[in-house]
Amino acid sequence: MDTEYEQVNKPWSELYKETTLGNKLMVNVGMEDQEVPLLGSNFLTKVRVGLSGGYITMRRIRIKIIPLVSRKAGVSGKLYLRDISDTTGRKLHCTESLDLGREIRLTMQHLDFSVSTRSDVPIVFGFEELVSPFLEGRELFSIYVRWQFGLSKNCYSLPQSKWKVMYQEDALKVLKPSKKKASRTDSSV
C-alpha cells in the first residue's frame, strides 16, 4: 500500500478556517468514487452512499487532521486504521509517529480491504501509542481522537475507550523533583 503523509506548519487562524472542511475518506462503490466526511466522534453525521455493487473497496483515502493539542505540548502518536467488526480490531494500516500539534495530511492510494454492502463493518481511525513529555495525570486532550466510518442501515456507535498514554523516559529524566522540593523549603523558611 502506498502511503504519503506530511505535517504542515500553518498559523492557527488559517487552520481554524479549514476545520469546517473536516477529514474526508474517498470510497469506491462499484465504478464510482464518493467522498465521505469524517467528523469527530462527538458529532453525528449521516452520509448516503449509493450501493451499486456487492462490495465497497477503500481507496484513495485522504485524511486531513487539524492540530489536536497545542504544539508546545509535544504530544505525538501513530494513526491506526482498524476493522472493528470483531473483538480483534484488525489493523489495516499504521503510520509512523506524528506530531499531534501540527496539521497532518495522510494519503493512501490503496487499502487492501473490502466491505460487503450488506454487512455492518465499521472502520475506525484513531491515534494510539501516544507519547507525551508530561507527567501522568495531566489532561492532554480536549477532544476525542477517534473517527468512525461505518456501513450500516442502523445507527451504530462505538463504546467509549480510553487510549493508553506512554511517556518519554528522557523527557521525564529532565524533571528534577529534588530541586523543586528544595525551593519550596527555602520559600517556607
Curated annotation (Swiss-Prot):
Keywords: Host membrane, Membrane, RNA-binding, Transport, Viral movement protein
InterPro entries: TBSV_p22
One of the record's GO cellular component terms: viral capsid
Main location: host cell
Lineage: superkingdom: Viruses
A single BP term in Gene Ontology: transport of virus in host, cell to cell
Keyword Plastid: no
Molecular function as annotated in GO: RNA binding
A Pfam family reported for this protein in Swiss-Prot or TrEMBL: TBSV_P22
UniProt subcellular location: Host membrane
Function: Transports viral genome to neighboring plant cells directly through plasmosdesmata, without any budding. The movement protein allows efficient cell to cell propagation, by bypassing the host cell wall barrier.
Similarity field: Belongs to the tombusvirus/aureusvirus movement protein p22 family.
Protein name: Movement protein
Species for this entry: Artichoke mottled crinkle virus
Organism phylogeny: Viruses, Riboviria, Orthornavirae, Kitrinoviricota, Tolucaviricetes
